[in-house]
Amino acid sequence: VDPGAGHLEQLEAAERQLLVFAREINHLYQAERARAAELERALDRLRGSYLDMIKTLAFVVEAKDPSTRAHLQRTHDYACALAEAVDPELAADEQLRYGFLLHDVGKVGIPEAVLNKPGPLDAGEWEVMRAHPLLGVQMVAGIKSLGSAVEVIRCHHERWDGKGYPSGLAGEAIPDGARVFSVADAFDAMTSDRPYRKAIPFDRACQEIADGGGSQFDPAVVEAFTAIVPALPELHASLHGQGAGGSGPAGAGAGPGAVDSLAHSIP
């Protein structure tokens, strides 16, 4: 018997086994790819449903408070642009962007007589209005996947100097996303008409934000805001559906003063 022939047969048998094994591996790989693709499609559907839910919650807020119609989308877009300037990783946080849309969800629990009052709120009404951040947190408490969005809902009225609400947080104790959003929120408040006052000019609103650095706002966020000011007129005009160059004249009683008297007085 030729010993070489036996060795060749062994090699051929091993080759056949390897081919069978390779086919099985390829079959498993293709099956896993198909499974992963189906899971990705299911995840996309889930993300779409989740985003629809977020948008529905935001719509409920705007439906209850007509004076802030489109405010949620505008502040979301301003905040996203500002977050990108502050820290691209922050801007990439999907949960945070949900928080930008849902920041005022707690207003659903505020009486319409307070929300839609055509004038400044009295002390008692202010106390009611100041409850909306914590009401919002309670409303979304069951949505575990919101993550950092809850920080924006809770803390978007906190101030760098600790004089905000609901918790009186100061400085870096305020979550990053909320620090970014408070600037975007104030800017939109100042450049939008409200029932009891007209919007102030774009340039003046930018100056008010700059003046609020270190008191109402995080100085680093204000610095980032100042850096994107040249790009803001186009975004501002598109969100307000008008030509660039300002929001129109300030209304009666909107004379010189700190940002507090214009933006932060708007709940």
What are these regions (language model features)?
Residues 23, 44, 51, 58, ...:
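Metal-dependent catalytic cores of enzymes that make or break cyclic nucleotides
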Residues 2-55, 59, 66:
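Amphipathic alpha-helical coiled-coil "transmission" helices that mediate dimerization
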